[in-house]
């Protein structure tokens, strides 16, 4: 199907000074919503701010969420996540980032037979971004996925790893 989507997002970014050498974005608060020609609609929002705790060179706490009740368009109609990013945990590595996060996706109760029938899927994440030089970083990540895909099959969880390589030219 082809149709229109209408999205509105409002952002607020307080003007505060950043610590010298910070690579993290400033504080940001966002809220928005969308609607489509096919009765798809939803709300979303996020917030990012400095924790105020003496964590490394700089840090950010973040939370985000979304809700879209139409199962035909979204098998996971709700999401809530959050985390913490700390820059310069180790004094000799001021550009590195320690990343901690978690998320919870609520799965639709209106799922037809054969679809996931558990109420949620969740994830915990631990990552570390190594800044190798000004143009290259390496980010290994470890994730534990709870209740994978919401299936009723007894699966204790999935442990997964990944490595992201970023090169800026």
Predicted regions and their residues:
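Sequence/structural signature of outer-membrane beta-barrel proteins
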Residues: 15-20, 31, 52-54, 66-73, ...
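Transmembrane beta-barrel strands of outer-membrane/channel proteins
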Residues: 8-14, 61-67, 82, 98-104, ...
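Surface-exposed beta-loop-beta
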Residues: 1-50
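Membrane-embedded beta-strands of outer-membrane beta-barrel proteins
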Residues: 43-47, 82-84, 100, 125-126, ...
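Outer-membrane beta-barrel transmembrane domain signature
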Residues: 75, 91-95, 99-131, 147, ...
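Short loop/turn motifs that connect adjacent beta-strands in outer-membrane beta-barrel proteins
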Residues: 1-7, 19-24, 51-60, 88-99, ...
